């Protein structure tokens, strides 16, 4: 069976995702499409708008054959680690092709850029450090400056959000298994972070979440496939944002000592002190980010750091594993064929997982389900089995 892998958040699953999924199957001639999906919290350092099990249902209803969870310790980090670990899981599960959307849309250019970085790794790292010192800027900007300086302006624009992820997928594949074929299509219509829904049927997940959180589900439904609309209408829990967790974060920052926070993943350069001061002044999470912001810290980095503090995520990361959130018959058949040749632990029953392997994931789910209205999902990692569909 020919397998194509995709890396997703489905926050929530919308028409753009449906187009991407259909193209992935069509253009790669895949027998099975496997999605590695973020769980309770997503890469920009935010809670997912609804629980991972509901988003898994959306994925399966739309035609994904298998949904595998990207562990929270990787799903909530910067693009390099996010991509590295997603590709590691897809490689372990033996996908032939990695398919992704990007602003650029030409997979060969991503591969070429990745090869150049691998071949010039020492020079590239040195250029990044020089940019950090000379310009006193964020790591992301220093990375982009170093890339342009060494490889020119025209190779690939890694300032665009999906190009950044695509480049890091290509880099991870180049380092881990260059035989994985890359395939990319250009994103259509909505930009990744567009906050307004301006097109007939395609809008960004950001714009769709904005509508849903404002209670405008009917308006948001114009940009969602029928299967997602049905799941959203049947969902009895709340739609979530940082608003639901702000008081927990505020308490954590006020209660903890500065030295205690130094050991949290992503905390550096004394940023915890700014955060602790802001926590006593901010009225809400948006205020908090504005009060904490500096030239060296992007909003996304601040959100990720705040999330790691909320989750009490220590600097060490967990080991990778394959945690099945859901599958259809095709996915079950594929897993049965390859199970013996998969090098990472496969988890379908959490209670049978190796001791300690899921510790961070379980804590993240428990914190996520503290939000009012999620009582039915508390301890869900234990009592909600993988979702199986015909």
UniProtKB/Swiss-Prot annotation:
A GO CC term assigned to this protein in UniProt: cytoplasm
EC number: 6.3.4.-
Coarse class of the protein's main subcellular location: cytoplasm
Pfam families named among the record's database cross-references: HIGH_NTase1
GO biological process, one term: tRNA modification
Matching InterPro entries: Rossmann-like_a/b/a_fold, tRNA(Met)_cyd_acetate_ligase
Top-level taxon of origin: Bacteria
Binding sites annotated in the UniProt record for ATP: 7-20, 101, 162, 187
Subcellular location: Cytoplasm
UniProt record similarity statement: Belongs to the TmcAL family.
Its job: Catalyzes the formation of N(4)-acetylcytidine (ac(4)C) at the wobble position of elongator tRNA(Met), using acetate and ATP as substrates. First activates an acetate ion to form acetyladenylate (Ac-AMP) and then transfers the acetyl group to tRNA to form ac(4)C34.
Protein name (database record): tRNA(Met) cytidine acetate ligase
Species of origin: Listeria monocytogenes serotype 4b (strain CLIP80459)
Gene name of the record: tmcAL
